[in-house]
């Protein structure tokens, strides 16, 4: 009888622990879903710049095709610690980018306009828990994403530095239905003010230090709970240190290698409500930091280059933590004019 009572006691304690764990998992899951409604990331996806961050295209039309692949299997809380969730968060996007740079100068620099035509994007989210595999959240979607329009870019070039300032806005052209699980777009407008700088550390411009900054502000979005909110502003910094190596003596082929990284922070509170009773400013600010490498193959005379970038996130707060891969190429028409002889 005593053994039976002891067994019953242990069984009830196990049930209580299980209930607590389930309640904890549900709480974290609800918090994650609420946070996603508050847009726990910037509209700008970091990992796109790296080396040559301050160099504008040569006069003419430049086409860039870039594939972005972000994957994460860890979800961090406001302290930067992993939550008891398992699963994955994946984004695959193909950007078709068009630059136009006229030949005339403005304020001593080059003018440029750019548009990232509706991006083909595919995203998926699968959340669960090791202890409760049947309690899970699944979402995902494929389609045309938001459009990045950059109507103003002004850049200057000297012997030791290339730099530009730019303004862009994000048009919510991607599919977005409040509360839907297959959204591709963000559901709101955004504004971005940017600066890119490349410093040549050597006279032959082979060694470079690069820095890109982006300040983004956000418009109002409608949540799946019928309320409206404004995601907090975000700041993104991308950096890189690179070295160009000639593959041929005539410099017709170059290989560029370097260390790159990115940092992104939410710098102001969300405003509005996630639900009619849950203020959006209760969601903690997010941040993420990554480091990796870039390699670029350049054919200067043809205006062609191919690039590959890989960056691993080593810290994330209140958002997923994973890695970013970007690869693709660009071509300029007409072919760039050869640089003047030194």
Question: Where are the predicted features?
Answer:
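Short loop/turn motifs that connect adjacent beta-strands in outer-membrane beta-barrel proteins
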Residues: 39-40, 53-60, 103-112, 156-163, ...
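Surface-exposed strand-loop-strand hairpins of Gram-negative outer-membrane beta-barrel proteins
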Residues: 40-42, 70-93, 128-140, 182
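Residues on the lipid-exposed face of transmembrane beta-strands in outer-membrane beta-barrel proteins
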Residues: 53, 65, 96-102, 149-154, ...
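Transmembrane beta-barrel strands of outer-membrane/channel proteins
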Residues: 61-71, 113-121, 165-171, 209-217, ...
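Outer-membrane beta-barrel translocator domains and adjoining extracellular loop/strand segments
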Residues: 73-81, 124-133, 165-166, 175-183, ...
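Residues that define the transmembrane beta-barrel architecture of outer-membrane proteins
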Residues: 88-95, 138-148, 185-191, 229-237, ...
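Long, hydrophobic/aromatic-enriched structural stretches that serve as scaffold segments
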Residues: 89-157
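Outer membrane beta-barrel transmembrane domains
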Residues: 223-342
């Amino acid at each position: 009888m005593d053994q039976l009572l002891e067994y019953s006691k242990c069984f009830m304690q196990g049930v209580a622990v299980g209930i607590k764990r389930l309640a904890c998992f549900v709480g974290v899951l609800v918090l994650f879903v609420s946070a996603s409604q508050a847009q726990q990331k910037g509209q700008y996806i970091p990992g796109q710049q790296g080396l040559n961050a301050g160099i504008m295209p040569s006069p003419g039309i430049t086409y860039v095709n870039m594939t972005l692949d972000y994957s994460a299997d860890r979800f961090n809380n406001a302290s930067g610690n992993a939550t008891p969730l398992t699963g994955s968060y994946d984004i695959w996007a193909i950007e078709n980018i068009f630059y136009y740079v006229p030949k005339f100068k403005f304020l001593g620099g080059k003018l440029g306009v750019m548009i990232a035509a509706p991006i083909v994007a595919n995203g998926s989210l699968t959340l669960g828990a090791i202890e409760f595999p049947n309690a899970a959240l699944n979402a995902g979607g494929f389609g045309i994403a938001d459009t990045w329009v950059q109507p103003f870019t002004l850049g200057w070039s000297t012997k030791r530095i290339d730099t530009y300032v730019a303004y862009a806005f994000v048009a919510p052209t991607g599919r977005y239905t409040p509360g839907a699980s297959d959204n591709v777009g963000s559901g709101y407008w955004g504004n971005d003010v940017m600066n890119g700088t490349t410093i040549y550390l050597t006279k032959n411009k082979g060694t470079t230090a690069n820095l890109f900054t982006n300040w983004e502000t956000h418009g109002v979005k409608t949540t799946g709970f019928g309320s409206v909110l404004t995601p907090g502003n975000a700041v993104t910094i991308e950096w890189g240190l690179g070295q160009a190596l000639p593959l041929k003596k005539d410099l017709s082929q170059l290989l560029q290698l370097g260390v790159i990284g990115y940092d992104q922070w939410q710098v102001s509170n969300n405003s509005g409500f996630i639900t009619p009773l849950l203020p959006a400013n209760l969601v903690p600010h997010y941040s993420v930091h990554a480091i990796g490498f870039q390699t670029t193959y350049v054919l200067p005379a043809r205006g062609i280059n191919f690039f590959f970038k890989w960056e691993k996130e080593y810290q994330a707060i209140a958002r997923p933590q994973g890695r970013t891969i970007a690869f693709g190429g660009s071509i300029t028409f007409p072919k760039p004019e050869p640089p003047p002889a030194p």
